Amino acid sequence: MKIAAERYRALGGNVEIILKPGCDHHPHSLDNAEPVVDFIIRNQPDYQKKQVIHQRGSLTNSYLKFAKEKKGCVAFLGGSITEMRGWRNMIQEDLKQRFPKTEFTFIDAGIPSTGSTPHAFRFENDVLQKGMPDLLFVEAAVNDDTNGFDYIRQTRGMEGIIRHARTVSPEMDIVMLHFIYDPFIPLLDKGIQ
């Protein structure tokens, strides 16, 4: 495989070796095809241009907890994008691979059709009563648009979640995700975010 990979890279191709024990050479027999799908997606033309990340801090607190204490609690608060199998599962698997000796508790608090305002009201019951997250992921953008709350209420909902989280655990790392869906695309094309 090494020779084929080197030759393909020399021709300008992208190669990533994904070891899957017990499935021989048949990719359709993989228990989890996410690494293959992720590789294909990451290597699409203009993929990097479409990635928008605004980093406002770090994930140092949760990293140190996972790496040194070998325990970690990670919560996922969001709508159907969070509830269904997808990004949440990929992050859970990635964390388990990065920190194989860490015992994780994952709080899956995705409920379809809910945005930041409902999240603010359910954060205590659906997340904090199940554990104190070291790392919190919050997703709401698509349902914020469809729930009918104006941008002020959406902002207040998200700020309420963040303030509540910071009040109960100032060391909690927080990642806010804002996915898009079809009605957002014309706005993005016009440069409106």
Task: Tell me the role of every PLM-derived stretch.
Residues 24-25, 82-83, 114-115, 143:
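Glycine-/small-residue-rich active-site loops that bind phosphorylated ligands and cofactors
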Residues 89-105, 109, 114, 118-193:
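Alpha-helical cap/lid subdomain in secreted, periplasmic
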Residues 46-77, 81-104, 129-134, 193:
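N-terminal secretory targeting modules
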Residues 1, 76-79, 140:
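Short glycine-centered, acidic/aromatic-flanked micro-motifs in structured strand/loop junctions
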Residues 7-10, 65, 164:
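Alpha-helical scaffold elements within enzyme catalytic domains, especially in hydrolases
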Residues 3-4, 31, 35, 39, ...:
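Alpha-helical elements of Rossmann-like donor-binding domains used by nucleotide-donor carbohydrate transfer enzymes
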Residues 2-47:
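C-terminal catalytic histidine-bearing segment of alpha/beta-hydrolase fold enzymes
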